[in-house]
């Protein structure tokens, strides 16, 4: 479930879903290190894990600058922040005293079963970090070219960290749109595509032949809450990527 200030609260939603479902895994797709303290995030995901009978997954990534600008939050050192937060949360969940990332001996008062931590990643550095420290990687894409690029990088970094590549699960955060009328299906997907394009790093855009000027125009429209303008900027090439 997405963690975005414009949507329903992710933790409330996950709590309700924990009580209304029996088998599916439940998690954040994704939260971030900026809008919540790592100790609170650890407590929240541990609570969801208890409510759901051990079905929780914590998805965490760097978020996007455009959103944080609107919220008045400085998007500083995303790679370091994700790394520090993942390590701190893992320590909290193990009921260890945490004295890193600004904490001073903080500790949770309860434990729960192991919760996998997935890192949301697209760019090379974040993909490598995920290979080094995460239980899984949630890639905001579904095109085969993105995985041809990402998987070898993730596996190489996992091996460098002394891990087995198969210990890091690689997942696609896939978006789809279905309609009997193909044109309607494409049109319905454009808002989601616009947000993905606006939040994609330059190397991802280049891989799919999407110009920086096109992406910048969409990002600027979103920052103005001009969603129609953002959708109008979405091209066929973008929807197919």
Description of each model-found segment:
Residues 1-241:
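Active-site-adjacent structural elements that line small-molecule/cofactor binding pockets in enzymes
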